Amino acid sequence: MTSLSKSFMQSGRICAACFYLLFTLLSIPISFKVGGLECGLSFTVTLFTLYFITTTLNVLARRHGGRLYIFFTNCLYYSQHFIIASLLYLFLSGFSNDELGNVLKNKYNESESFLEALKNSLNSNQINYVLYYYYYRFVVQPWQFVLTKSTPFFTLSEGFFTILAIQAVGETNRWLSNDLNSNTWIISSLLTSGGVITASLYYLYRIYVTPIWPLSIQTASLLGLVLSMVCGLGLYGIVSQKGSVIESSLFFAYIVRCIYEISPKLATTATDEILNLFKDVWQKHQRNLPTADNLLCYFHNVILKNAEVLWGSFIPRGRKKTGDFHDKLISILSFEKVSLISKPFWKFFKNFTFSVPLSINEFCQVTIKMASESVSPAIVINLCFRVLMFYSATRIIPALQRKNDKQLRKSRRIMKGLYWYSPCILIAMYTHLILQYSGELKKDLCIWGCSEKWFGVDQPEIIVDSWGFWNWCNIFCTILVYATELIGSGS
């Protein structure tokens, strides 16, 4: 395979990945916002299953199949990107029906088996909704259960991977400053650290003054303990030269972010404030720029009008006197008669070239409007942050492990498998964030007195908020991991 064909295939994969990311970011929130919880869960588990099956077939074909099977599975894998919109429309149209809602609420014929229900409903108009119900019951509900119980995994793994990324940034900055002997990197790292610490202190101040999250005595005490430990670890890393200024500032900023994540409403408000600030700055600078028409208006007002003027210049304005045979032949084949014949084609071409982009523009505007009303900036920012941390971990962990060639190849195969199944991980992560910020996750978590068998009789139940509890666990686990790395590492 030539380098040109490899570059072409790589470009195609990148375009398909961007197309998939865009459609995933837009379609999943729309399914939850428009269709409801059941529609969103059904749509996401269908996407997850499709990507899991096609990825597995692709991996098996690459390992055991020939070129024909590899080509077929590749086509199957990349073609599913184009059916996301059709799947979204299918589930939106299905769950918008009132009959299906009644079926889901009343648990339609729960005593019957799946085959019996299908057999009894063959002559009924509700066969599609029966299929929807059982699909929801046997596929979607386990998916919802897994997402509900996966909060500790996503939260704690994010903290661990973030520590790896922070230390990788610190090592890179240390190499740029010492090995290259460049004062520019030292000054830039100090300026960056100062900006990060200033922004973190500002948003830490907002936590104490905002009425969105009322602080109790226990919460304020925990915050004071956490901030004291973080500042102490940061100063210890700088003084002992086991860390750096950029590491300490990023670590402090991440802990402040985790504190915001304890309250989803607080995190959403902070994200909206940041985006509104960027929006105000952009609008202020945009007023100073000369406004111009958009591309479609330019296409209609300039290009089409110039084409009409050019076309009209070919048409003779007056009739000339024709005396000889040559002039008669020219008059027969004149531009006037040619224009009469080709005028309908020109009108069709003109209307087609304007109406089709206009319809596409209207469709895109409707989609963007639905997406803007459905997509939460806090969810997208959290998703991008988690994807970045998880991707960084897949690069950092193999680099930290000193292995022989055989173990290194095995580690690379594992990381390659993670890359192959990354769409499934992304769908699960995105759906979990949407459920978290919409309040659909199980909020109550019993940590004491839940079972008489384990805790004994007459033990008081201690029930806490699930999301807040696991975020506090993430904060303390992250501090513990970073402290272990600082104390256990050499200077």
UniProtKB/Swiss-Prot annotation:
> Would you tell me the protein name for this molecule?
Protein ICE2
Q: Which range is the signal sequence, renumbered to this chain?
A: none
GO cellular component terms given for this protein:
cortical endoplasmic reticulum; endoplasmic reticulum; endoplasmic reticulum membrane; perinuclear endoplasmic reticulum
Q: Pull the Lumenal topological domain ranges from the record.
A: 35-40, 96-149, 206-218, 316-373, 435-461
Instruction: Please give the PANTHER family that the UniProt record associates with this protein.
Output: PROTEIN ICE2 (PTHR31726:SF2)
**Transmembrane regions:** 14-34, 41-61, 75-95, 150-170, 185-205, 219-239, 295-315, 374-394, 414-434, 462-482
Q: Which is a GO BP term held by this UniProt record?
A: septin ring assembly
What are the annotated disulfide bridges? none
What topology does the record note for this protein and the membrane? Multi-pass membrane protein
Record's miscellaneous remark: Present with 606 molecules/cell in log phase SD medium.
Task: Using the UniProt record, give the first listed, main subcellular location.
Answer: endoplasmic reticulum
Topological domain, Cytoplasmic: which ranges?
1-13, 62-74, 171-184, 240-294, 395-413, 483-491
**Keyword annotations from UniProtKB, A to Z:** Endoplasmic reticulum, Membrane, Transmembrane, Transmembrane helix
What molecular function terms (GO) are annotated for this protein? Answer: protein serine/threonine phosphatase inhibitor activity
Where found, per UniProt? Endoplasmic reticulum membrane
InterPro entries from the xrefs?
Ice2 (IPR013635)
Q: What is the native source organism of this protein? A: Saccharomyces cerevisiae (strain ATCC 204508 / S288c) (Baker's yeast)
